From Swiss-Prot:
First-level EC class: hydrolase
Known function: Protease subunit of a proteasome-like degradation complex believed to be a general protein degrading machinery.
Cross-referenced HAMAP family: HslV (MF_00248)
Subcellular location: Cytoplasm
Protein name: ATP-dependent protease subunit HslV
Gene Ontology cellular-component terms listed: HslUV protease complex; proteasome core complex
Gene: hslV
Family: Belongs to the peptidase T1B family. HslV subfamily.
Catalytic activity line of the entry: ATP-dependent cleavage of peptide bonds with broad specificity
Active-site residues, record numbering mapped to chain: T12
InterPro entries reported in the protein's UniProt record: ATP-dep_Prtase_HsIV_su (IPR022281), Ntn_hydrolases_N (IPR029055), Proteasome_sua/b (IPR001353), Proteasome_suB-type (IPR023333)
Keyword hit for Protease: yes
Length: 182
């Protein structure tokens, strides 16, 4: 029996930066199905836990929203403790047969922590306070690191500029940029 699969859903670049006690997380708005752009203004950033955290997602949208719902429940269960909620979600992601099939990543920032929860159930805390996920993430990450090192731009400005650079390079990233700040 021949296995046929649906076109791969590719969408997004999400980047978050913490600088001088301020955090910003932003994304582009493009969603593609195979080689076709199906939406230009997808909302990929959410405020969580009484507005104290920002979370963004990349990957299959329904999968990402499922994970965000579960993450929010973990935040509530653990009193808003970002690291504990992230580790518990990652543990569930690795051990639950249903969750293991979900294809998404989540980037989360608070004013002092930046984490990535990967599609393999890993919790990653970058040393430099910059998180990036999605198809244009490496372009945005390189831009953000350079801007952090060589400018005095705010976290919000670094996120904005990094996404603009990624949009100029990555075909799965557009310039419909949304940035949220804490």
């Amino acid at each position: 029996m021949k296995h046929t699969s649906l076109p791969e859903i590719r969408s997004t670049t999400v980047i978050g930066v913490i600088r001088n006690g301020q955090a910003a997380l932003g994304s582009d708005g493009q969603m593609t199905l195979g080689n076709t752009v199906v939406k230009h203004s997808t909302k990929k950033i959410r405020r969580l836990y009484q507005g104290k955290l920002l979370a963004g997602f990349a990957g299959a949208t329904a999968d990402a929203l499922t994970l965000l719902d579960r993450f929010e429940a973990k935040l509530e269960a653990f009193g808003g403790k970002l690291e504990r909620a992230s580790v518990e979600l990652a543990r569930d992601w690795r051990t639950d047969k249903y969750l293991r099939r979900l294809e998404a990543m989540i980037a989360i920032v608070s004013n002092d922590r930046a984490l990535i929860i990967s599609g393999t159930g890993d919790v990653i805390e970058p040393e430099d306070g910059i998180v990036a996920i999605g198809s244009g993430s490496m372009y945005a990450l390189a831009a953000a690191r350079s801007l952090m090192k060589h400018t005095s731009l705010s976290a919000q400005e670094i996120v904005q500029e990094s996404l603009a650079i990624a949009a100029d390079i990555c075909i799965y990233t557009n310039n419909h940029i949304v940035v949220e700040e804490l």
